[in-house]
Amino acid sequence: MKSILWLCVFGLLIATLFPVSWQMAIKSRLSSEDSETDQRLFESKRHSDAIFTEEYSKLLAKLALQKYLASILGSRTSPPPPSR
């Protein structure tokens, strides 16, 4: 009878200790996966920001060049002001 009681106590002790360690292992694995996912998202965001910045810089340069050429061609093709 005592052996059955000790067996039940030992089984209960084992059952309470192991699920806690399994949960801790799962949590640590999930947290490492979360940090990897966060890192990938950060790198992706930086990449898209760099692409946007590069394209925006090209657009600004193109607009500045168009404005400069328009000012040069406009001064060249406009008729001289009438003399009075």
UniProtKB/Swiss-Prot annotation:
Give Gene Ontology CC terms.
Answer: extracellular region
The record's account of how the chain is modified after translation: An amidated Pro-81 is described. Such an amidation is however not compatible with the sequence displayed. Indeed cDNAs do not encode a Gly that could serve as substrate for peptide alpha-amidation.
Tissue distribution = Expressed by the venom gland. Not expressed in the pancreas, liver, stomach, small intestine, lung, heart, kidney, spleen, ovary, and brain.
Q: Which InterPro entries match?
A: Glucagon_GIP_secretin_VIP (IPR000532)
Q: Name one Pfam family in it.
A: Hormone_2
Q: Which GO biological-process labels does this protein carry?
A: regulation of blood pressure
Q: Which GO terms describe its molecular function?
A: hormone activity; toxin activity
The record, for SMART domains, names: GLUCA (SM00070)
Q: Which residues are propeptide?
A: 24-44
Signal sequence coordinates: 1-23
Q: Where in the cell is it found?
A: Secreted
Q: Which UniProt keywords apply?
A: Cleavage on pair of basic residues, G-protein coupled receptor impairing toxin, Hypotensive agent, Secreted, Signal, Toxin
Q: Which family does it belong to?
A: Belongs to the glucagon family.
Main function: Has vasoactive intestinal peptide(VIP)/secretin-like biological activity. Interacts with rat and human VIP receptors 1 (VIPR1) and 2 (VIPR2), with the highest affinity for the human VIPR2. Induces hypotension that is mediated by relaxation of cardiac smooth muscle. This vasodilation may not be transduced by VIP or PACAP receptors.
Protein name stated in the entry: Exendin-2-long
Q: Which organism is the protein's source? A: Heloderma suspectum
